[in-house]
Amino acid sequence: MDSDDNRTLSYEVVDHESDIGVIVYGKTYEELFSNAVYAMADLIVDVSRLKENRKMHEVITGKTPEDIMVNLLSRVLFYLDTYYILYYRITSKYSDGELDAYFYGSEIPEGIEYRNVIKAVTYSDLAVKPEEGYAKIIFDL
């Protein structure tokens, strides 16, 4: 199943000790993964100020949906830290242990204000539950 670009992206920020977390909503793995990418990017910068000018394709693997979530978001952080490109939108297909994803994003403009500097995605309190309509992710600041 393809994720739908026209859906309403929904997430809420949750406090977690000295870290920051999000709860993202969706009815499928694809929606949860997509909303998690957007939520993390929006925690980093105001995504509405970015102009989409980058696209890439990657297959993200993992033994569990939780592994895929951590690997996916860690990959987004890698591109931000290494190439100053923030991917904030994906379209994807998920099947057992594999997420085939197209990433869309932007080079980070000079002088843009960072909302948060996320160091890592954690397994702390991690949950990926499309059958219950949500995923919870905690980020190390």
UniProtKB/Swiss-Prot annotation:
Asked whether the keyword Nucleotide-binding is assigned, the reply is no
SUPFAM superfamilies, sorted: MTH1598-like (SSF69819)
Q: Which residues bind Ca(2+)?
A: D19, D140
Tell me the leader sequence span. Answer: none
Q: What InterPro entries does the record tag this protein with?
A: Archease, Archease_arc, Archease_dom, Archease_dom_sf
GO BP annotations of the record are: tRNA splicing, via endonucleolytic cleavage and ligation
User: Which stretches are annotated as coiled coil?
Assistant: none
Kindly list the GO molecular function terms attached to this UniProt entry.
Answer: calcium ion binding
Q: Does the keyword tRNA processing apply?
A: yes
Q: Which Pfam families does this one have?
A: Archease
Q: Keyword annotations for this protein?
A: Calcium, Metal-binding, tRNA processing
Function comment: Activates the tRNA-splicing ligase complex by facilitating the enzymatic turnover of catalytic subunit RtcB. Acts by promoting the guanylylation of RtcB, a key intermediate step in tRNA ligation. Can also alter the NTP specificity of RtcB such that ATP, dGTP or ITP is used efficiently.
Family that this chain belongs to: Belongs to the archease family.
Q: Which NCBIfam families match?
A: PRK00407.1
Please give the name of this protein. Protein archease
Name the source organism.
Thermoplasma acidophilum (strain ATCC 25905 / DSM 1728 / JCM 9062 / NBRC 15155 / AMRC-C165)
